[in-house]
């Protein structure tokens, strides 16, 4: 007996040490930019963090975008409780840890679909932009995969506790539980003499009921109107694009029809296969869920909300693996294997996703020196368009005082804070500028404006843009602490600088501002009076800067 137990334990360890390194390698290939330069992203910075600061642990039950996301909020709460300055790194690594756990369970779970580690590898080799890879907010996309696994779990295994935990955590983190519940009830019809299966299905039903209740009462969950006339696009976007959409998109129709025919023939050849019927149902269900959230006309696996291809591509990969591994027809096996290999090549153009550095730590160091501060939060990885996490001076001090990793900076951080207007807000007016044109010092080299030649009553625009963004030069202003001006720039900023001539402050790369933003020079470490030099040192046509000052 001891020998058998030892053999089983050895086999488990061997399986672990084979599975996890493969998963880690694939994860790093897809997420290395986020691991090297972790940032705060989307609703994680605008909902989850503020919600935890205000409500504590009870914020776990607050919906985001209309539904519960318990797992991402747990990552957020744990990470920020450890350190606010290191929050991007800690939360990113925890999110990647969730991905590895999902990879391991998919690779080793006793399920009725074949593939093992190939099923798990398929999840990390999807031919779509890795939007949901390595982000704490999107970790629920990964835990939701385990609901697909539970559907095909071998009922003879004595691991109901693990399945119960999966059902609770995944169902309370994603509406996908609504799609998988019917399959669990189908299982019960075949396993009605198994009380554990009945109990697990009732547990799943309870979780789905909670999720649906939240979705109904939040009045936020958005459902896009499904256009029946556009259904034909499913073949090209969700099936053809899987094989060839990133490398030869002009052939998506041909490959879409080929793959669809392959799936249909396989199901018809084995009508009594629960696994194939289950995968066919999940493929249809996940596609319908995707196009119910956003119009299919706006979806694209590389540039148009690629997260909505995540589940359909996973199920399609698993379906093709079943054909390649179990089909008796050599022709069908070779066809499925060809598409799977082609999909890996198709993933190469979208293997990783790079993003701009937002200097989270420097912004946090600046935060205590302003009455209020807006920490930038990524939307799509482009610094030109960000959201903001708004904190008061008191909140910043409280968070940093509890942070074991925080060390007071030897510099003053940013001398100014950037205030951006939401499109629905009133535009900036003359009263939002306190610096007059007579504060410009002799030797001004900014003799242009911005490309649109912006004009407001009582305001003067000075900029480095002449006939193009290739103009260079500098402008010096005499300012006082608390002064405000408006600023705008091109999409590039490598040669744009703002230098405050005061102790504790270094030369700062200018912010990217496609629209006018306010620069508020109210850092309490600034002297009463100081000079600021705005410089454009780049001859690139896309680089320029401009400021708005009062006319008198």
What are these regions (language model features)?
Residues 21, 271-297:
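Transmembrane alpha-helix segments characteristic
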Residues 140, 300-325:
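Hydrophobic/aromatic-rich transmembrane helices and adjacent perimembrane loops
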């Amino acid at each position: 007996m001891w020998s058998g137990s030892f053999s089983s334990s050895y086999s488990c360890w061997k399986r672990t040490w084979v599975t996890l390194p493969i998963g880690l390698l694939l994860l790093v290939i897809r997420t290395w930019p986020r691991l090297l330069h972790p940032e705060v992203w989307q609703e994680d910075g605008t909902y989850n963090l503020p919600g935890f600061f205000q409500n504590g642990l009870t914020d776990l039950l607050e919906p985001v975008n209309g539904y519960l996301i318990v797992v991402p909020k747990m990552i957020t709460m744990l990470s920020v409780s450890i350190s606010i300055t290191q929050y991007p790194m800690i939360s990113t690594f925890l999110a990647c840890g969730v991905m590895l756990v999902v990879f391991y369970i998919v690779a080793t779970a006793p399920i009725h679909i074949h593939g093992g580690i190939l099923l798990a590898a398929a999840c990390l080799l999807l031919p779509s932009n890795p939007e949901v890879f390595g982000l704490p907010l999107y970790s629920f996309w990964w835990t939701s995969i385990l609901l697909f696994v539970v559907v095909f779990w071998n009922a003879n295994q004595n691991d109901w506790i693990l399945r119960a935990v999966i059902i609770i955590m995944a169902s309370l983190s994603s509406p996908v539980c609504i799609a998988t519940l019917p399959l669990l009830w189908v299982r019960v019809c075949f396993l009605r003499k198994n009380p554990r299966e009945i109990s697990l299905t009732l547990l799943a039903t309870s979780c789905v009921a909670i999720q649906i209740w939240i979705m109904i009462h939040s009045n936020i969950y958005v459902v896009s109107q499904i256009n029946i006339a556009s259904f034909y696009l499913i073949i090209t976007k969700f099936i053809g694009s899987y094989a060839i959409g990133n490398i030869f998109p002009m052939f998506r129709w041909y490959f879409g029809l080929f793959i669809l025919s392959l799936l249909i023939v396989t199901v018809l050849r084995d009508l009594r296969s629960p696994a194939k019927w289950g995968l066919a149902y999940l493929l249809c269900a996940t596609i319908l869920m995707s196009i119910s959230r956003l119009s299919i006309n706006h979806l694209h696996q590389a540039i148009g909300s690629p997260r909505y291809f995540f589940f359909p591509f996973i199920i399609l990969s698993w379906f093709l693996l079943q054909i390649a591994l179990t089909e008796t027809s050599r022709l069908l096996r070779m066809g499925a294997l060809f598409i799977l290999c082609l999909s890996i090549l198709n993933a190469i153009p979208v293997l990783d996703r790079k993003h701009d550095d937002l200097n989270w730590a420097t912004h946090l160091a600046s935060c205590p020196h302003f009455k209020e501060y807006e920490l930038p939060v990524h939307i799509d990885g482009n610094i030109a368009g960000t959201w903001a996490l708004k904190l008061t001076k008191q909140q910043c001090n409280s968070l940093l005082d509890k942070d074991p990793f925080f060390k007071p900076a030897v510099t003053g951080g940013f001398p100014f804070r950037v205030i951006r207007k939401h499109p629905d807000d009133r535009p900036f007016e003359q009263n939002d500028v306190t610096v007059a044109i007579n504060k410009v010092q002799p030797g001004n080299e900014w003799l242009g404006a911005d490309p649109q030649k912006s004009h407001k009553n009582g305001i003067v625009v000075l900029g480095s843009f002449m006939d193009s963004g290739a103009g260079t030069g500098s402008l010096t202003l005499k300012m006082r602490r608390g002064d405000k001006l408006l600023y705008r720039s091109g999409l590039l900023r490598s040669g744009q600088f703002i230098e405050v001539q005061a102790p504790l402050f270094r030369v700062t790369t200018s912010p990217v501002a496609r629209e006018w933003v306010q620069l508020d020079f109210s850092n309490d470490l600034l002297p009463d009076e100081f000079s600021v030099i705005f410089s454009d040192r780049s001859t690139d046509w896309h680089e320029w800067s401009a400021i708005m000052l009062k006319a008198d």
